[in-house]
Amino acid sequence: MLEKININGLNEVIYKGKCNNGLIVYLWSSPKLKSTFMSLSVKYGSLDTEYIVNNVKHNVPNGTAHFLEHIKFNEKEGTAHEFFHKTGADVNAFTTFKYTSYIVYAMNNVKDNLNHLLSFVETPYFNNKMIQKEKGIILEEAKMGEDDPGTVGYFGFFGSLFKNSKYRNLVTGNQKEIKSISLKDVKDVYNTFYCSN
């Protein structure tokens, strides 16, 4: 059963439903739009560096959420980017303090693109070789952020404002933290947060 949510002032309606596996789905269709936007968001962000599973406390380095976002694009046969490129869709992702979102914009092949979005996010494929390769890519991204005036200013401000809070940390993690992320960290986080229930 879908719940109907009226968006006041926009004359639009969103439908909300919950799948049997616990996944919450929002649907919005508008005759004004020709393209389709799809987003799958996981309630796991850069603040989630400590968590408890079965009464056992786990700690992962800052930057693990962003690292996992990157590495999820790898598949057993190629990358998610390759699939979406073939269908003419654009795919991207981003990590915030509180969640990670995988997004697809498509004009055609909506069902195939939606199925692949669900598949690549919900199917884990990690190995040590991938972890090491991705570290190099993310370290370069972190270096660029350390040289970007906007990023430096933003997190400098947050560092002053939130001296004793995780909000002071870069979402990407710093270089030392990125280097310390392990295959075990990635697998543990995925198995804890990237499940529907």
Describe the residue ranges of each PLM region.
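Charge-rich, well-structured scaffold segments of protease-associated domains
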Residues: K18, E75, T79-N197
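His/Glu-rich zincin catalytic helix
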Residues: M1-A80, K187-N197
